[in-house]
Amino acid sequence: MLSAAEGILLSIATVEAGLGVLGNTFIALVNCMDWAKNKKLSKIGFLLFGLATSRIFIVWILILDAYAKLFFPGKYLSKSLTEIISCIWMTVNHMTVWFATSLSIFYFLKIANFSHYIFLWLKRRTDKVFAFLLWCLLISWAISFSFTVKVMKSNPKNHGNRTSGTHWEKREFTSNYVLINIGVISLLIMTLTACFLLIISLWKHSRQMQSNVSGFRDLNTEAHVKAIKFLISFIILFILYFIGVAVEIICMFIPENKLLFIFGLTTASVYPCCHSVILILTNSQLKQAFVKVLEGLKFSENGKDLRAT
């Protein structure tokens, strides 16, 4: 049985997961409908669709994995189930981080304003940058998959039990975990770098506009401030996701500490939930579609009230 604190945290995580699935499903559907309507999908539309779809899977894996560990620990420790979940998690996590990285770099190259020759060279070659990122995904996934298979083969016994035996020493597990996630860590560094550089560019540009005296300047400055806030929020949420996942991994060595494990789950679930809301509110296409949905619901509700009277 769960304690009161554990139950509250698990409820919060479940609500976050539900909102994350709804928000990302909405983003995926909007871009899918745009694809069907225009017979093509823009780069940003493709990235948003891929990010939303992969995060739906991530949310389901996070929440189902947590419920299995908390309420069905005996079945969860089976070797075959652990291997399947590990492979699916590794693949989907790579996809999620890659789409987030690509989206960050795409916005950076599109919006940022630097005079450095490397930036200008990259800005003129977005297709090559996109292809390079795709190769990064494939290579990092292949490396991670090979290490995952190697670790699984070297631990045929007690595969689901990280707390006993000599095969899963903490030091060995930590080194294996870093090697398995070296590609994801590299993508994380690229994402943070692109976001920080974009924040610097927007901040410099907003300061330059402060010398102008016009209402147009005020609108531009406000837009830049909103963009900076969005980027800072994304960075915080993205880091929280990795912290939450790391906490869940650490809990493999202390399975009796359910509160810490659920705290990690709650922390990790914040990112797919809140970032989808931020995307809907800041992306004009998604925001318009969301407003139409709300208007449709309001019209339907008014129609029911009229029929009732």
Curated annotation (Swiss-Prot):
First-listed, main subcellular location of the protein, grouped into a coarse class: membrane
Gene for this chain: Tas2r105
Extracellular side: 1-9, 68-86, 150-177, 250-258
Protein name per UniProt: Taste receptor type 2 member 105
Location in or out of the cell: Membrane
Gene Ontology MF terms in the entry: bitter taste receptor activity; G protein-coupled receptor activity; taste receptor activity
Function: Gustducin-coupled cycloheximide receptor implicated in the perception of bitter compounds in the oral cavity and the gastrointestinal tract. Signals through PLCB2 and the calcium-regulated cation channel TRPM5.
Tissue: Expressed in subsets of taste receptor cells of the tongue and palate epithelium and exclusively in gustducin-positive cells. Expressed in 15% taste bud cells in circumvallate and foliate papillae but only in 2% in fungiform papillae. Expressed in the duodenum, antrum and fundus (part of the stomach).
Species of origin: Rattus norvegicus
